[in-house]
Amino acid sequence: MDSRYNPAAIEEKRQKTWLELGLDKTPSASNKPKFYALSMFPYPSGSLHMGHVRNYTITDVIARFKRMQGYRVIHPMGWDAFGLPAENAAIDRGVPPAKWTYQNITQMRQQLQRLGLSIDWECELATCSPDYYKWTQWIFLQFLQAGLAYQKEAAVNWDPIDQTVLANEQVDNEGRSWRSGAIVERKLLRQWFFKITDYAEELLNDLDKLTGWPERVKLMQANWIGKSTGAYLEFPIVGIDEKIAVYTTRPDTVYGVSYLVLAPEHPLTNRVTTKEQQAAVEVFIKEVSNQSELERTSEDKPKRGIPTGGVAINPFTGEEVPIWIADYVLYEYGTGAVMGVPAHDVRDFKFAKNYDLPINFVIASPDDVAGFDLTPTSEIDGITQLVEVDYKQAYTEPGILINSGAFTGISSTDAKQAIIEYAEKQDFGKVRVQYRLRDWLISRQRYWGAPIPVIHCPNCGIVPVPDKDLPVQLPEEVEFTGRCGSPLTQLESWVNVPCPTCGTPAKRETDTMDTFIDSSWYFLRFPDAKNEQQVFDSSKVNDWMPVNQYVGGIEHAILHLLYSRFFTKVLRDRGLLNFDEPFQRLLTQGMVQGLTYLNPNKGGKDKWIPSNLVNSADPRDPQTDEPLQRLYATMSKSKGNGVAPEDVISKYGIDTARMFILFKAPPEKDLEWDEADVEGQFRFLNRVWRLVTDYITAGVSRKKAQSDLTKAEKELRRAIHTAIQAVTEDVEDEYQFNTAISELMKLSNALSDADKNSPIYAEGIRTLVILIAPFAPHIADELWHLLGESDSIHTQTWPSFDPAALVADEITLVIQVMGKTRGAIQVPAQADKAALEKYARESEIAQRYIEGKEIKKVIVVPGKLVNFVVS
């Protein structure tokens, strides 16, 4: 038996044993409670980084802990394997996307297996496998049958040189194509959408059910859904028999409308534009069409607009207001038209100032209008007194309506409802509930994705691919040039097919699905991952779901998590699931940060200097000798501050890496990588190793503990059961792994100071090894076998603490004189207030400080202190 901890000698051996015993396999249904532990599956980039290691370590601790608590656990792994990088690799390196992806999967699987994670690899799936995307396509057809999938025109990024559609990440900050350098245009193409808006209300309301989710994630989703209640108002257009419909959450400001704004894409744009303005408007629309949605709505850029020459009538005042077109109004949002109220909206105020438009204040602070007659008139558009206020910026606070006809003098809060009711009576408006959420555009003009399983027939229209013909497989003999759109459009042998309904020559859909589709249901496939006959056996999935603990980054707070919730609800409504929400509890782990140095931006880009090139005592740029900023930042190649997992593991072992990751910071916080702290965890595991091996070598007593324990034994037993209670609560309730490991350190310290011949010591050694097992599984299992056990430690039952053992015979009583601590004594734990005062008075400490003084008052805080107030 080696007296020194040698991780390299035990880790591979332990992993081999776990594999032979099948410890990680998902058990069948039984009377045991279930626990589904899941980390967000990775994109197979080919290289594991420390962020991955942290994510999967957290989930692994939970899975191991729950197994030892008697749960049947599923802890699977898969690959989010479709996506743009594989196509780029095909273009740049001539490697087919499938080959590149599967090579990366093989490499990353080996890296993950090296970590010794308790993953059931028999559940493994890859979204790019036909065995998986067959069912992704089947789910698409379920959406189509339910009326939740449809086509309409939508704008895409278009490279005019390469004649191809670009993803947002392929467009640089200057609006140029990453490959050709061409100025990217916006182009309308017919695209597929999912009607997620049909579920907006339920997605919003059911956030209240997610009691195990971080509040900030729920708030982010609520804001993304963006429910608001406001008014739908119609403004007649002068000269044509049309009305401009606007949606506003501020109907109380309608008397302050000084212009209307249409989105450039609005269908009324051409009709309201006068001949005099037509040429200028067309130029403006062309310019805006080449801007991304992000550019148009950015808070950092000034808003641009142009008058159409057309005018509309404010139905409340009868006054004419000019109609403008502006880049910041998007047709997909609301009605594609907004009313401009610069007096009471910050954005409108800036726009009006820029274009010299009227600013009409119709709400004011009560203090500012205290001397005015604000009695409303009987005429809805009349005013009793023109109230002038001199605000230097938009007034956006609640207030009193002024210059607002019959609504003058009432609060802006009350005016909202009153104005909507009036508009409804006059038939030019109504109350409306609106959502910021828009339908989900799922079309991608790319090759490496799940083909959309429909056929376009000139006679029958859109025809679903029959279930028996699924999957619609991606063709393999494809040339990747990065030009002329998706390679699928060029393959006539693949595109041209007979219509399944009438037999007429027809064409396949050449768009593929957004990769978020694949990740919106993968967690439902894991419990029945090898099912070839159906998407999954509902009885199995309903048994295992929902996921009890989901772990992943905050960057997925909105899209992935929202889409997964949407899919779950749709499949429930299709009769496949019997639950409403997919993820019971969510943990968003922090980033892993590494030390780096920064030479701040001085007219150019920030310059990152790797720490290995810098003298930490006097950090300076090695090229310019300028002083550098020392900081921790998210690990990346550009910053040169990454730490390769394999380097840490080869030097310290897997368990040390796990212990550092778990101890350094709470899981939801960012973690700063510090090798000194890694070494600290390595020393701790060495101490545990020596404690156990010294105990074994010494051959000390292992007889069962007797009821008649010495004072020291009682204290040791209390330390043991305090550790059991604390570690259990830290892992089970809040996932405070760092404080759990602190408790393990306290227990090891207590054992180091204890009598090695005591039977309680034997209990403590075995308890320490069991408690450390979820955190450092290799060393724990090895020590368990060295203790003479034949079974794996990971099959042991998690210990329960004995409440009686936690009760101390004695407590520490602090002695104070005039509120100042003078020392402490040990007293019986059950002593009452009178006894505590007696012990304190008789103590040597009190005698020393109160001798010769008159005691005026004694304050006793039971279980804590006695304070003497003296003259």
Swiss-Prot record:
CDD domains referenced in this protein's UniProt entry, alphabetically: Anticodon_Ia_Leu_BEm, LeuRS_core
GO BP term (any one): leucyl-tRNA aminoacylation
GO MF term (any one): aminoacyl-tRNA deacylase activity
Reactions accelerated catalytically: tRNA(Leu) + L-leucine + ATP = L-leucyl-tRNA(Leu) + AMP + diphosphate
GO cellular component: cytosol
Residue span of motif 'KMSKS' region: 634-638
PROSITE patterns tied to this protein: AA_TRNA_LIGASE_I
Enzyme class: ligase
Subcellular location: Cytoplasm
Membrane-traversing stretches: none
Domain of life: Bacteria
Keywords (A to Z) from UniProt: Aminoacyl-tRNA synthetase, ATP-binding, Cytoplasm, Ligase, Nucleotide-binding, Protein biosynthesis
UniProt keyword Protein biosynthesis present: yes
Positions contributing to ATP binding: K637
Chief localization: cytoplasm
EC annotation from Swiss-Prot or TrEMBL: 6.1.1.4
Motif 'HIGH' region positions after renumbering to this chain: 42-52
Membership in a protein family: Belongs to the class-I aminoacyl-tRNA synthetase family.
Protein name from the UniProt record: Leucine--tRNA ligase
Organism: Nostoc punctiforme (strain ATCC 29133 / PCC 73102)
Gene name for this UniProt entry: leuS
